[in-house]
From Swiss-Prot:
Gene3D superfamilies: 3.40.190.290, Winged helix-like DNA-binding domain superfamily/Winged helix DNA-binding domain. It comes from Escherichia coli (strain K12). It comes from the Bacteria. Residues 1-58 form the HTH lysR-type domain. This is Uncharacterized HTH-type transcriptional regulator YneJ. It holds the Pfam family HTH_1. InterPro entries: LysR_subst-bd, Tscrpt_reg_HTH_LysR, WH-like_DNA-bd_sf, WH_DNA-bd_sf. Keywords: DNA-binding, Transcription, Transcription regulation. Residues 18-38 bind DNA. The lineage of its organism: Bacteria, Pseudomonadati, Pseudomonadota, Gammaproteobacteria, Enterobacterales. The gene is yneJ. Belongs to the LysR transcriptional regulatory family. GO terms for biological process: regulation of DNA-templated transcription. GO terms for molecular function: DNA-binding transcription factor activity; transcription cis-regulatory region binding. The keyword Transcription regulation applies.
Length: 293
């Protein structure tokens, strides 16, 4: 097994095609096919499921991809450390939509300014999706609702979010779930931690939401609430950043439900130089930078 084989494997895993991967790594397709077969023989497992002209990762391939990505990232880091260079390489960050919108824009701008050699990418989604991306090696780190009790994850607390029940104008104050029992709610998909928190708030008071409408953005949720179609749960920081927030009522949850903490998490043992550089720009106490294990 050598680094070239790992680079080829990663390229095919990403492209799903020998031809496309060969163009990316500047090799002829037959060379990739031969080297991948050699790698599979050496490991004693099939890394890909071959379907006509397409390849998709087998379960063993998914597991191997995590390690292959970590190995190549560490090699890049070792090269830059020995050469005395500034941090460089790929850095893929995932984030909750609200965090990306109101918490980190200035940090991202400063990160890109300071480290132009880092190839940075950002994706957003619910906590469950972002955590899966980290565990699968697709993301170097992600902002999610935490803490996460997982043996393969490290992380640090970064932001404390106040959650608000958002209702149409004219609603009486909402202090408990029974007051909005049966109301239609607007939320993200079921793997969103805020949605699970919202539903738990209902159930703890012996209440239940009406129809749960799944939305793709907080802006869509707010528009539906403004129209009088239901209610939503939105972080105060996000709500106050959106046009139209003066057209709704907003009520903080009771204290035991009111606050959630956003964490930055990464795979254990995969704290690369780009990630360390990013953490240094976050406004978090030094005592929190060590995270948990």
């Amino acid at each position: 097994m050598d680094l070239t084989q790992l680079e080829m494997f990663n390229a095919v895993a990403e492209a799903g095609s020998i031809t496309q991967a060969a163009a990316k790594v500047h090799r002829v397709p037959s060379n990739l096919t031969t080297r991948l077969r050699q790698l599979e023989t050496e490991l004693g497992v099939d890394l890909f499921i071959r379907e006509n002209q397409r390849l998709r990762l087998s379960p063993a391939g998914h597991n191997f991809l995590r390690y292959s990505q970590q190995i190549l990232a560490l090699v890049d880091e070792a090269r830059s450390v020995v050469a005395g260079d500034e941090p460089q390489g790929l850095f893929s960050l995932g984030s909750l939509e609200s965090t990306a919108a109101v918490r980190i824009p200035a940090t991202l701008a400063e990160f890109n300014r300071r480290y132009p050699k880092i190839q940075f990418s950002l994706s957003t989604g619910p906590s469950g999706t972002m955590l899966d991306g980290v565990l699968e090696g697709k993301l170097n780190a992600a902002f999610i609702d935490g803490p996460i009790n997982h043996t393969a994850i490290d992380g640090i607390p970064v932001y404390r979010e106040e959650l608000m029940i958002v209702t149409p104008q004219g609603y009486a104050p909402v202090t408990r779930a029974s007051q909005v029992n049966g109301s239609n709610i607007y939320a993200f998909r079921a793997n969103c931690s805020y949605r699970r928190h919202f539903e738990s708030w209902f159930h703890a008071d012996g209440a239940a939401p009406g129809t749960i409408h799944e939305m793709e953005s907080y802006h869509g949720m707010l528009a539906c609430v403004i129209a009088g179609a239901g209610i939503a749960l939105i972080p105060r920081s996000m709500l106050e950043s959106m046009p139209g927030h003066h057209q709704v009522e907003a009520w903080p949850l009771a204290e035991q439900w009111r606050w959630l903490t956003t964490w930055l998490v990464w795979r254990r043992g995969a704290k690369t130089r780009p990630l360390e550089a990013f953490i240094q720009l976050l406004d978090v106490p030094d005592s929190a930078r060590q995270g948990y294990q």
